[in-house]
Amino acid sequence: MIINIKETTMVRPSQPTPSQRLWNSNLDLVVPRFHTPSVYFYRRPGNASDFFDARVLKEALGRALVPFYPMAGRLARDEDGRVEIDCNGEGVRFVVAETDSAIDEFGDFAPTMELKKLIPKVEYGDDISAFPLLVLQITHFKCGGTSLGVGMQHHVADGASGLHFINSWSDIARGLDIAVPPFIDRSLLRARDPPSPSFPHIEYQPAPSMNTSPAPIQDPTVKSDPTATAVSIFKLTKQQLDLLKSRVSAKYSSYALVAGHVWRCTSIARGLPDDQRTKLYCATDGRARLQPPLPSGYFGNVIFTATPVADAGEITGEDSGLEAAAGRIQRALMRMDDEYLRSALDYLELQPDLSKLVRGAHTFRCPNIGLTSWTRLPIHDADFGWGRPIFMGPGGIAYEGLAFMLPSSEGDGSLSIAISLQAEHMIKFQKLLYEI
């Protein structure tokens, strides 16, 4: 796919905004240090002559950046070297592009390298203030459809806050007011004074590494290359999800059940020996779990992590593996109450170097896995005036072992799993995923 860039502009807030330095909480600082990629796809309505008109979008964007002014700023460091946001109103990058390709050529919208072409590339360097915190790209396809590619610097917002901004922008483009104004002050997530963690917080401990056991025997029909990774997306229908529920005796949340299934299938596909420790990273939104809950519209990162750990043999059994995996996940999630989350903030405050806790390839690779659910997020609400997206999902998966759970845009009760695994493991994972 060849992308032709037609226009690149910097869109600034349409009115003067506060010029200040915004303090980042510890949760804002332990996230991966890149722009989180996502892509929306839209079909063109038959009567739309101004479909995704850049003028309309840029005008609405400038207005949205007034209440969401940190998004138009840049990263900076305070006198102690701590990363903060310089709310200087320098703006966000807005790109208009076109391609001779058609939306249908993307098939199931797996977050491959081709999908990444729909998001502006950010050049990182030593100067953290050199790049915009938000980059956007409108790409017009020959079929008449359009994509919106979003790259959002993770220090600025998590998924919930990022969608709050995008959906507010789309509301303004439709002539509506912002439904929930953003709450900018992040000091609500300061650690207690003095910090007093009351749990060991294994979520921030090093991930298990592979045992020195002999490597599993490989399928001779599959070419082996441990460095090669593959990215795929798999749909689970409502009927398949109901069948999965019938396989366990206890009642589990949909997330615990599906995550348990993915954890089990991944462990088998990787050929983990029974005594191999494996950790599952479950991203958990703390907004409603904290007491009192954070204000509606809190803008920033509020992602904590539940991390069930098991010996692979406990979760790979044919009869009891799914129940064991789902049970561990549900218990780990139930523990994420106000006391635990406040303890996590205190634990982070006592760490001499938060950069050592930043998640990366070393976190999720074999034998571990991360699974982030977007099923409760309003990922299909960005209607700019020409209808809702037919698909929204990650624009790439940065690490082997990282996966996303996505809701259906059709409201049919299905969901999809987008995942990155070693290529030789992906084939077996797909087979296992559908053996319900």
Curated annotation (Swiss-Prot):
Active site annotation, chain numbering: H154, D383
InterPro entries: CAT-like_dom_sf, Plant_Fungal_Acyltransferase
GO BP of this protein: alkaloid metabolic process
E.C. code: 2.3.1.-
GO molecular function: acyltransferase activity, transferring groups other than amino-acyl groups
Domain of life of the native organism: Eukaryota
UniProt entry keywords in alphabetical sequence: Acyltransferase, Alkaloid metabolism, Transferase
Tissue: Mostly expressed in stems, and, to a lower extent, in bulbs.
Pathway participation: Phenylpropanoid metabolism
Family the UniProt entry places it in: Belongs to the plant acyltransferase family.
Biological function: Hydroxycinnamoyl transferase that catalyzes the transfer of an acyl from p-coumaryol-CoA to various acyl acceptors. Can use feruloyl-CoA and caffeoyl-CoA as acyl donors.
Name of the protein described by the UniProt record: Hydroxycinnamoyltransferase
